[in-house]
């Protein structure tokens, strides 16, 4: 999502999705992470499960916030472009290039907004799996 200089490039939706896919690796591998780091009853004395669960929870929250910020930043940038194109279309409605570009940007904006729904599902699934494995070891802070 972020280029080496720290700026987001939201112009190409395919790249946007590819970067989100990479950013969702922690969620995709949550079950594996829990299985390899949270001990079963027979190994509970060898590993501090509460510390492990806390660290995993913090990593999850950091990833969720990072993706949420990235998606919302791209939505804001694309919304701004759509607004500018609407103004151009209002001034010169016969310019087909502007009309086509506006449709393209509106479609991209709609797809980016749908990523927020995907993000909600991914986050809920990860937190559910986390809670099932770590509920006896770590209780996350409540959000007010």
UniProtKB/Swiss-Prot annotation:
One protein family per Pfam: MIX23
Coiled-coil region(s): 82-120
Membrane-spanning parts: none
InterPro entries: MIX23
Record keywords: Coiled coil
GO cellular component: mitochondrial intermembrane space
Family to which this protein belongs: Belongs to the MIX23 family.
Protein name: Protein MIX23
């Amino acid at each position: 999502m972020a280029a080496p200089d720290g700026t987001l490039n939201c112009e190409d939706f395919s790249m946007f999705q590819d970067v989100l896919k990479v950013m969702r690796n922690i969620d995709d591998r949550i079950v594996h992470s829990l299985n390899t780091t949270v001990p079963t009853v027979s190994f509970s004395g060898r590993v501090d499960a509460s510390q492990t669960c806390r660290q995993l929870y913090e990593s999850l929250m950091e990833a969720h916030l990072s993706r949420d910020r990235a998606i919302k930043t791209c939505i804001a940038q694309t919304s701004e472009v759509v607004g500018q194109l609407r103004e151009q279309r209002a001034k010169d409605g016969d310019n087909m290039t502007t009309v086509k570009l506006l449709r393209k940007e509106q479609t991209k904006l709609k797809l980016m907004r749908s990523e927020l729904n995907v993000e909600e599902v991914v986050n809920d699934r990860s937190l559910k799996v986390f809670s099932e494995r770590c509920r006896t070891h770590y209780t996350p802070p409540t959000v007010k």
